[in-house]
């Protein structure tokens, strides 16, 4: 049985979030939460919250052993990009792209 949680329009670059997601993909939930808790960057905090939400969703399903849950997959998709302009010299402007991510965590019952 699977459990999933999604966070959309998160203000973190998909490229940076994928680096963190690769570290915990396929691990037991307890190990993944420990790694994310002590990883000192913004994507780790966001993925940690989505992982907790997926675990809470799994507790609502009947007949699921929450202690045996494994991170089956973490999907980081690109969300819309917010465009801003930074004024520069002589009337010019530079485009700033603030990237967003859609983060999905899928948990499954598995053998450790």
Swiss-Prot record:
GO terms for biological process: translation. Keywords: Ribonucleoprotein, Ribosomal protein, RNA-binding, rRNA-binding. InterPro entries: Ribosomal_uL22, Ribosomal_uL22_bac/chlpt-type, Ribosomal_uL22_bac/org-type, Ribosomal_uL22_CS, Ribosomal_uL22_sf. GO terms for cellular component: cytosolic large ribosomal subunit. Pfam families: Ribosomal_L22. GO terms for molecular function: rRNA binding; structural constituent of ribosome. Gene3D superfamilies: Ribosomal protein L22/L17. The keyword Glycoprotein does not apply. The keyword Protein biosynthesis does not apply. It comes from the Bacteria. PANTHER family: CHLOROPLAST 50S RIBOSOMAL PROTEIN L22-RELATED, LARGE RIBOSOMAL SUBUNIT PROTEIN UL22M. This protein binds specifically to 23S rRNA; its binding is stimulated by other ribosomal proteins, e.g. L4, L17, and L20. It is important during the early stages of 50S assembly. It makes multiple contacts with different domains of the 23S rRNA in the assembled 50S subunit and ribosome. The globular domain of the protein is located near the polypeptide exit tunnel on the outside of the subunit, while an extended beta-hairpin is found that lines the wall of the exit tunnel in the center of the 70S ribosome. Part of the 50S ribosomal subunit. Belongs to the universal ribosomal protein uL22 family. This is Large ribosomal subunit protein uL22. The gene is rplV.
């Amino acid at each position: 049985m699977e459990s999933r949680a999604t966070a959309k329009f998160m203000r973190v670059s998909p490229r940076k979030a994928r680096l963190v997601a690769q570290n915990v993909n396929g691990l037991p939930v307890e190990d993944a939460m420990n790694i994310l808790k002590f990883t000192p960057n913004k994507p780790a905090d966001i993925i940690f919250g989505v992982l907790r939400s997926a675990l809470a969703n799994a507790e609502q399903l009947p007949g699921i052993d929450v202690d045996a849950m494994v991170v089956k997959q973490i999907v980081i998709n690109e969300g819309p990009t917010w465009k801003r302009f930074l004024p520069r010299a002589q009337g010019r402007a530079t485009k700033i792209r603030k990237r967003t991510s859609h983060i999905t965590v899928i948990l499954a019952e598995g053998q450790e």
